[in-house]
């Protein structure tokens, strides 16, 4: 029987501090100028500084809450293990984790449009615009104007994470053979992230969803066999294998463009960490296919006096089956290829061979 309880913490990630300094109201100003604009610089001249009293369009900023605290998590674990005979043991372990983490919130977010109204309005044309940016700006707490701000993302302590999982494992050992199997059933969710604000900052809880690493089912088996034999040719061989089968990662289904006038358009961030774009059902509601692969290893030791030579051959993804990553699925509602996979770099490597020879002295 075993168990534990503890609080774990970490220091502020430096890039979030840099964001607050560079992307804040007194940080960098990004603007676009046409080549006909009087302020457009001519090589080798550089863009001059803004003159006193210059009027700038409303911009978006990222700042840090003055009461920001370190991220931390409370973790509880409990497990039991039992020996069955002299060669087999079984174990059950449970783990619960509750975390408090950083998360951006847009303190000047427009009034959200309810999901049922959004989906009904876009049912016939998923690429339609049901509210312009100007109309959305009218619903912001602070109206964007000259020298003002549109998005006011503030890094807060409102982020949360939840994890609970149970792992079942068995180990069987004999003189030539060792076999292990482990199955984990788990659930991992989080809310907000320290990269960008969510789809609806006025209701942070609506961002709660599976984490990008959520793996409800995870089965790993392995075996290692010392092949019987003796002599220079038949002795010293070992064959081992590992099989892995797990749930595919989640991903978010979203609408293209900016149907509600949020102001980010096609540049809206949307990945496994979070989603600023408009979604029909929320974050990480779809899931990729199961990931399955098997690796095989064969090795032999040769004794050379007091020294040893080790030969090893590895085959990764023995069955050469295709494993599709969640980031490759086309997730735009209305896209003719919606739900299909793009392949390419979003596919785990196919079968690979590796050979090694080691001399130990």
Task: Report the location of each language-model feature.
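Extracytoplasmic gating/loop element in the C-terminal half of outer-membrane beta-barrel translocons
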Residues: 49, 230-305, 310, 316
């Amino acid at each position: 029987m075993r168990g534990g309880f503890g609080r774990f913490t970490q220091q502020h990630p430096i890039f979030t501090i840099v964001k607050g300094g560079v992307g804040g109201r007194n940080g960098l100003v990004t603007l676009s100028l046409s080549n006909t604009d009087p302020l457009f610089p001519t090589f080798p001249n550089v863009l001059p500084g803004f003159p006193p009293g210059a009027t700038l369009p409303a911009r978006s900023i990222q700042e840090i809450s003055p009461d920001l605290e370190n991220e931390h998590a409370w973790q509880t674990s409990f497990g039991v293990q039992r020996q069955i005979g002299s060669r087999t043991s079984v174990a059950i372990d449970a783990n619960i984790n509750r975390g408090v983490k950083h998360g951006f919130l847009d303190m000047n977010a427009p009034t959200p449009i309810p999901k049922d109204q959004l989906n009904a309005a876009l049912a016939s044309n998923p690429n339609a615009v049901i509210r312009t940016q100007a109309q959305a700006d009218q619903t912001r707490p602070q109206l964007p104007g000259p020298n003002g701000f549109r998005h006011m993302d503030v890094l807060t302590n409102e982020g949360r994470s939840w994890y609970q999982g149970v792992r079942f494992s068995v180990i069987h050992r004999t003189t030539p053979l060792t076999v292990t199997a482990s199955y984990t059933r788990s659930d991992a969710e989080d809310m907000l992230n320290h990269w960008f604000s969510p789809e609806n900052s006025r209701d942070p809880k609506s961002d709660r969803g599976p984490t990008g690493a959520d793996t409800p089912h995870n089965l790993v088996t392995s075996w290692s066999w010392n092949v019987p034999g003796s002599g220079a040719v038949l002795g010293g061989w070992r064959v081992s294998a590992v099989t892995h089968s797990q749930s595919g990662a989640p991903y978010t289904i979203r609408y293209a463009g900016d149907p509600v006038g949020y102001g980010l358009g096609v540049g809206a961030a949307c990945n496994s960490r979070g989603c600023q774009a408009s979604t029909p059902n929320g974050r990480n509601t779809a899931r990729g296919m199961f990931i399955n692969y098997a690796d095989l290893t064969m090795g032999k030791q040769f004794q050379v006096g007091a020294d040893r030579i080790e030969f090893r051959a590895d085959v990764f993804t023995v069955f050469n089956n295709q494993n599709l990553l969640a980031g490759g699925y086309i997730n735009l509602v209305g896209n003719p290829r919606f739900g299909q996979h793009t392949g390419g770099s979003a596919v785990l490597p196919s079968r690979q061979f590796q050979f090694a020879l080691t001399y130990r002295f």
